[in-house]
């Protein structure tokens, strides 16, 4: 989605719910990447615990992707499909999306990812 503003919409919420990250962890990662102020409505200790959890998950995720590539389960076609999905979701970030459009995008995205994850 690039470095622009990320809108919290139905599609993004769906993706976060099914990801390995909580919405708070995603928020911390995003703000750190952008260089935005870090501690907001939480103690410094809680923030740094959340940051460590987020980093650990990201670290593990990158190793998992590497492992899947080595095993041939994350090939070029899979990368291309994920890239197209990412670009389509990025388009929904440019303007307000009607509820029926969001549901359709979510349905298609979920179906594609389910097919890709069959082992």
Regions of interest found by a model, annotated:
Residues 24-32:
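Short alpha-helical "packing" element that flanks the helix-turn-helix/winged-helix DNA-binding module
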Residues 64-94:
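Intrinsically disordered, low-complexity basic tails/linkers immediately adjacent to helix-turn-helix/homeobox/MYB/SANT
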Residues 87-119:
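Amphipathic alpha-helical binding modules
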Residues 31-43:
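Helix-turn-helix DNA-binding module
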Residues 2-18:
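Short, Lys/Arg-enriched N-terminal segment that forms or immediately precedes the first helix
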Residues 55-62, 66:
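C-terminal flanking helix
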Residues 53, 80, 84, 108-111:
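Charged, amphipathic alpha-helical oligomerization/scaffolding segments
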């Amino acid at each position: 989605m690039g470095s622009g503003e990320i809108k919290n919409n139905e599609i993004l919420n769906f993706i976060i719910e099914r990801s390995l990250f909580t919405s708070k962890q995603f928020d911390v990662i995003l703000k750190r990447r952008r260089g935005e102020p870090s501690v907001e409505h939480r103690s410094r200790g809680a923030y740094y615990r959340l940051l460590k959890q987020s980093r650990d998950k990201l670290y593990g995720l990158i190793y998992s992707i590497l492992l899947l590539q080595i095993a041939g389960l994350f090939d070029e076609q899979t990368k291309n499909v994920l890239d197209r999905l990412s670009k389509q979701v990025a388009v929904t970030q440019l303007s307000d999306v009607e509820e029926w459009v969001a549901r359709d995008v979510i349905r298609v995205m979920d179906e594609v990812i389910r097919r890709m994850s069959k082992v």
